[in-house]
Structure formats: C-alpha cells, structure tokens
C-alpha cells in the first residue's frame, strides 16, 4: 500500500475520515502468481487483444519510462470497484452474508425508521412485482413494515448480533427469518428499480447503522473471503429467498433472486501492479460503502492502492454509524458525485489534474470516465448495458474496427475506449469483447443503444456529439469538460 498516498489524503480530510483503515489493517501483499511487470502485460490470452495493446501503449506513453513523464505531477488511474475491479458486486454479496447470519446492530424499535431513510414520501406507496408467480404487486411501505416486524421477533429470540451467527436449523425453520431475508433483499431490488440512484445507493449502507467502521470492515472482509473462495461461497450461481405462505404479513409472500460469487482476477491484480510499477498511481472510486471496499482491497490483496473514496455515513458521538450520508466529506460516489469527489478529494493531490485512466462498467461511472480532459484511456467491462455505459461501449467498438490506437485518439483530443469481455459463469476474463453473463449460455455483446452510437460514428459524428446526443444523464457536464 502506498503510504505516501494515504498520508497526503489524510492531510486534506481529517484522520477519522474515509481513508483511515480499520484497526485490523495490515500492509497489502500481492498474490505470488502476479509477477512484477514493467511496460508489458502477462496473461495475454485472457485480455482481449485490443485491450492488451491499448493498456501496454498507455503504460509506454504515460508511464515513468516515457521521456515525457514528469514525476512532479504523477498520472493516476481511477477504478470503479463493483463489476470493474471485481467480477460481480461485493456489497450485494455482503447483503446476503448479513441476511443469512442476521448481522445487524440496529435496535428493533429503530429498524423501520432506518429502512424508511431517504425514501420520498410519494414513493412509499410505489409498487413492484412480488415475483412469486402470482403476478401481484407489493407496496414498498408494506414490505418495510413486514421486515421491521420480522426483525423484532428475530431480535427478541437473540438471533441478531453485530458479527452475525451461523444459521441454526431452528433459525432456518422460522417463518420470520425466511420472510425477513426475502423482504429485505426484495426491498433492495425494488428501491433500486423504482427510485433514483441517489435514494437507492445509500439505502443499503444504512444497514450498517449502529456498527463502528471496524465492525463493518471485519464483517465485510469475512464475507469477501468466503464468497471469494471457490471451495466455499464462490459458486457462480444464483440463489433466491422466498417468503413463507404460513405467515400473515401486509405484503404477502415475495421471491427474489441473488448472485453467489465475487473475485478480483489475476489480470486485474496485475493491472494495478503494472500501473504502480510504471509510476502511475491507482485510486478506487466506488458506490459501495467505504469500509466494505477497504476490506475488499485487503481481502483480495490488491496492490498499490493509493486511496479509496466511497459511500460514507456519519458517525454518532460513540463512533458508530447513523443512517445519514456524510456530505461533509464528499458527494455520493455515484454518477455526477464520482466526478465531483475526484475534483474535491483526488485531483488536488495532482495539481488539479483528472485521471489519465478510468475503469468502469455502468451508468454510475459514465460521468467520471468521460468528463475529464486529462483522461487518455477508458477501460470498460462489457455487461451489455442499456444505459449511458452503452455509449462508451459503442465508441470502443467503433475505434477498434477503425484501428484507432491510443496515439491517434489522443492526438485527436479523444480518449481511447477499450471494451473487455468476461465469463461470469466461472469468474474469468477472456480474449473477447463479449461477455457471458451469469447463468446465461449465449454471450452478450452490444445493446441497441451501443449499436446506435456506433452507427452514428460511422456516419461521421464526433465522439463529443454522440455522447451529447445519446446520454440520459442530465447532470453530465459534457465530454472532456472538467
């Protein structure tokens, strides 16, 4: 871990801020299988060949072996975490760990209040499918009421603990236990699909209310190690929760599915290490909760991380999280907030410069990956997105098919966009720009929106114009405007 990077940042934000690791922090050690690299990538069969070439060219052109390198203002890379640094989502996986083990520190009388946090009143009666085969729809407020009532029963039985417990046969047979898990995970999906991301992204972090940062870190690290281990929870399968039919509730039964498995591949570990070995700093900018991300950096031994900015809630006087986002530190680290957080927290350490490399996968990363003038290269993990991430996927394929390399793109004032595919059924990269999504048999490529962007570029539109004409994010400041 680059201690200078941490010290520089702590000088800007107080020592109790998002970058003070949990007490259990130890220096990151790199997996033995990841070699020391200078200006070249190993594992070439597992990187898409155009991606491999682009990254190598980036290191050669902007790393410390380049004659143009100035170490007084080091270039830096900014990585999203979920579905970018990692395959699949660490916080969604932690939610399953929490629910199965009832790892909460919320008082039973406060649970309903916590679950209501941030949800606009006019959205409480919003409905979402129960997905139990009945075709019925369920009100958000009814599911919240049920989950809070279930929690009181489970808490009274002594099954709720901060660290969580291995579920017993008695717990598994409990109707309230079954319903609580189903309603909580259903709410996560329902809120995410029916409300703005500024509501849904922080909502799941309020589950840590009552915990200290170190308690969240330790809980998350245990989850990461379990679901990142192919002999344990890393099954690359889908599971589901279903409410029982023999429990009287306001919402009635619901069913919800979830994914099992997370990893950080040897190729991604290598990329972090390669960048650092060539004088390029690396940062994480994530919409997951900050302690959850810090724990993942350690659990997966990600080398050379200079800093983490992520979702952070306020602490009470006893040092425990409350259900309130800490805007005093920075904006929510999603969408526009990822860019403003770079401007507030990271760029001042680099004389105001933006990231030279951006790594992303989805709508929440679109702003920071396209708005900064200093960004030379954008690495996109293909999930066949239909949101604004489809725009950059379409640009990447246009540049690839027209043999536009890094030097040419940068000379034209553009970033080079690179599209990397992967196999989510076994947690690996492969030499393809297509992705096999979890549970699917056929690969996914470009969404209709991405194909539209590629077509418009073929007709002669500029990258700036296709972004402006196709983006749905009204807060996007424009291509290379920061």
Spans of model-derived segments:
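Non-catalytic pre-domain segments flanking phosphatase-related domains
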Residues: 5, 9-81, 89-128, 132, ...
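N-terminal low-complexity, Ser/Thr- and acidic-residue-enriched intrinsically disordered segments
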Residues: 80-81, 86-89, 166-167, 365
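Solvent-exposed coil/turn segments that connect beta secondary-structure elements
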Residues: 82-84, 90-91, 313, 383-385
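A metal-dependent, Asp-based hydrolase signature
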Residues: 91, 98-100, 105-255
